[in-house]
């Protein structure tokens, strides 16, 4: 009888042990992950790449101790930066995107997690080479990045672009970026479907060309005023506004295959959306006044 009782207890323990361990593991995985919200890719000397990430701070003490001046033959990491409460900025330089991300994970020490990624910012210098497609595919396939992360090209240093990026209106940075891109896409001043999976598919397609969002910083000290132009018939960095956010998103970076070949202003993107039937609004200027008209996009059969 005692043996039977012991067997029953042992079976119960074996049944519940995986559940207990599973619950503990989930918490440990979250605690040990470096959740990246924004990522930047810049060209570095000697054919290297510099990857800069803005991530949730998590355990700042362990991150700082791991990232302080760590170096290896495969590349190097720079010191951890805390640009705002709740977020940290880390960067690593290596011969490839994968090595740089691996270096960040090894020295933080936390596993790089791109499931919450909202934007990938690529410097224009790098975007005008053939490296863009392979970088995006590595991020998407190997690190399983969020399919909906928006691809952005900037003429600025991409790392500095995400360093100065901050959420406003009390929103989390991830939510702020999500709302920001939705708003501009509804205004038809950025290309439709500029997300990671769509941009990769367009770059690999023989029938369509890819388009990413074009963005730049504006210090508001030297605004270029273009006579006879509407507010959206410009490129970012020269928009006539006084918003607190230093980064401006307007227009598109156009690609032929994996290589960036040109840009469109916000107004040109709006016209493109109108001609392709993807426009939701149209901004018209009459006697200097702007009028926004919502277009009927639903096709009716007769």
Q: What is each PLM-predicted segment?
A:
Residues 1-5:
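Short, Lys/Arg-enriched N-terminal segments with co-localized hydrophobic residues
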Residues 7-302:
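Membrane-proximal alpha-helical signals and transmembrane carboxylates
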């Amino acid at each position: 009888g005692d043996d039977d009782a012991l067997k029953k207890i042992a079976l119960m323990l074996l049944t519940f042990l995986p559940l207990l361990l599973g619950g503990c593991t989930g918490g440990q995985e979250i605690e040990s992950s470096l959740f990246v919200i924004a990522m930047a890719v810049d060209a570095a000397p000697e054919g290297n790449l510099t990857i800069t990430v803005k991530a949730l701070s998590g355990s700042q003490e362990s991150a700082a101790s791991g990232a302080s001046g760590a170096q290896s033959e495969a590349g190097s990491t720079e010191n951890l930066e805390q640009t705002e409460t709740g977020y940290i900025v880390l960067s690593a330089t290596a011969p490839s995107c994968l090595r740089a991300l691996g270096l960040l994970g090894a020295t933080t020490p936390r596993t790089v997690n791109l499931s919450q990624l909202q934007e990938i910012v690529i410097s224009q210098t790098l975007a005008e080479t053939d490296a863009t497609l392979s970088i995006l595919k590595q991020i998407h396939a190997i690190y399983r990045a969020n399919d909906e992360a928006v691809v952005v090209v900037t003429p600025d240093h991409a790392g500095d672009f995400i360093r100065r990026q901050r959420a406003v209106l009390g929103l989390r940075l991830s939510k702020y970026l999500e709302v920001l891109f939705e708003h501009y896409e509804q205004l038809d001043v950025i290309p439709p479907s500029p997300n990671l999976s769509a941009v990769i598919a367009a770059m690999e397609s023989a029938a369509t060309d890819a388009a990413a969002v074009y963005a730049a910083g504006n210090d508001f000290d030297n605004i270029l005023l273009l006579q006879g132009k509407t507010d959206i018939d410009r490129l970012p960095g020269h928009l006539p506004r006084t918003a607190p956010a230093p980064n401006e998103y307007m227009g598109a970076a156009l690609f032929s295959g994996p290589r960036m070949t040109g840009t469109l202003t916000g107004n040109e993107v709006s016209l493109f959306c109108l001609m392709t039937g993807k426009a939701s609004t149209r901004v018209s200027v009459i006697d200097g006044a702007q009028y926004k008209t919502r277009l009927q996009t639903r096709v009716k059969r007769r």
